[in-house]
């Protein structure tokens, strides 16, 4: 079983903890990581073009005038394409870019990404990460203590002081453990986790 040092907020070693090999020290399957990132980015896309056809335009269900006896050409609906305000015939529609990935593969991709960073010594575990007040300066001080840049901070539950302190720091993201995803893991150079977040991640990814 893999082990990792546990530090306090001042980077003083306070102990060690065992890590699940299945989650943090497994095989790195790069094709799964690539697939998961591709799915995430595709699902963020939204089509920006789209017009209403005659089925989508409101109103016009009633026949505008009777079929015969008026001397005009017969009409069935005032929302036909040749009417002003009618639907567009064969107009452009928004494309759906959504892709899917089954749950088992998504979990395996997250495990692979975590294992990759663990093997590259880019994971740091803290016993806790609580700030006494909202302080960007205090949070930046923690990052400098650990000598990390472009960092993903993973916590187990909402931490208002930490989240507000970090929100204006460039290349830093605070994420709750249940929202952990492959794209964020590979986007950042380093990951800082709390002990409780590690256990929460292991519980979610081992099941």
From Swiss-Prot:
The taxonomy runs: Bacteria, Pseudomonadati, Thermodesulfobacteriota, Desulfuromonadia, Geobacterales
PANTHER family xrefs: 50S RIBOSOMAL PROTEIN L4, LARGE RIBOSOMAL SUBUNIT PROTEIN UL4M
**Main function:** One of the primary rRNA binding proteins, this protein initially binds near the 5'-end of the 23S rRNA. It is important during the early stages of 50S assembly. It makes multiple contacts with different domains of the 23S rRNA in the assembled 50S subunit and ribosome. Forms part of the polypeptide exit tunnel.
State any GO BP term from the record. Answer: translation
Could you tell me one molecular function GO term of this UniProt entry? rRNA binding
Q: Which HAMAP family match?
A: Ribosomal_uL4_B
Q: Name one GO cellular component term.
A: ribonucleoprotein complex
List keywords of the entry alphabetically. Ribonucleoprotein, Ribosomal protein, RNA-binding, rRNA-binding
Q: Report the protein name in the record.
A: Large ribosomal subunit protein uL4
* Listed Pfam families: Ribosomal_L4 (PF00573)
Family statement: Belongs to the universal ribosomal protein uL4 family.
SUPFAM superfamilies tied to this protein: Ribosomal protein L4
Whom does it interact with, and what assembly results?
Answer: Part of the 50S ribosomal subunit.
